[in-house]
Swiss-Prot record:
Gene3D superfamilies per the UniProt record, alphabetical: Nucleic acid-binding proteins
Keyword Lipid biosynthesis assigned: no
Protein's UniProt name: Small ribosomal subunit protein uS17c
Domain of life: Eukaryota
Length: 132
C-alpha cells in the first residue's frame, strides 16, 4: 500500500461522469471575420501581403489608435497589384502562414454610387440622337 504523507501529493476526486445528453461539448459559435485591407506586397507567386488597419482603444489613455496587422492571402491568378483594396475571406490553411483568400473589391466611390443612385436616363440612351 502507498502511503501519501507528503504535503505536495494530493488526491482529487474523479471528474463527474458525463450524462447521455451532454456527451458532446457545447458548440462554439464565432462570427466570421470580414477583413478588408490594402495589398502591400506581391513578391511571392500566388500570394499577396495585405495590411489590415483597425481602430482599438489604447489600454491606458482610452483613445482609439490605429492597429496595423499584415496577413498573407492566396491570390491564385496573380491578379492584384500593390495598392489594390481586397477583402480577406477565411479558408482552410493553404500554407504555414496563408489562411485567407484575397477577393477583389470595387473602388470605394464606384461602389457607393451604384448603391445610392438609380441609373440616369441619359445613361440609358447611349446612341446619339439622329433627327433628320
Amino acid at each position: 500500500m502507498l502511503l501519501l504523507s507528503s504535503p505536495f501529493v494530493s488526491v482529487s476526486p474523479p471528474p463527474p461522469p458525463l450524462s447521455s445528453h451532454g456527451a458532446r461539448p457545447a458548440l462554439r459559435i464565432e462570427a466570421a471575420r470580414q477583413l478588408t485591407g490594402r495589398v502591400v506586397t506581391t513578391k511571392a507567386d500566388k500570394t499577396v501581403g495585405v495590411e489590415v488597419v483597425r481602430l482599438a482603444p489604447h489600454p491606458k489613455y482610452k483613445r482609439r489608435e490605429r492597429i496595423k496587422k499584415k496577413y498573407q492571402a492566396h491570390d491564385p491568378d496573380n491578379q492584384f497589384k500593390v495598392g489594390d483594396v481586397v477583402e480577406l475571406q477565411p479558408s482552410r490553411p493553404i500554407s504555414k502562414t496563408k489562411h485567407f483568400l484575397a477577393i477583389p473589391l470595387p473602388p470605394r466611390d464606384t461602389r457607393r454610387k451604384s448603391q445610392l443612385l438609380p441609373p440616369l436616363q441619359s445613361d440609358d440612351d447611349q446612341e446619339p440622337s439622329s433627327r433628320e
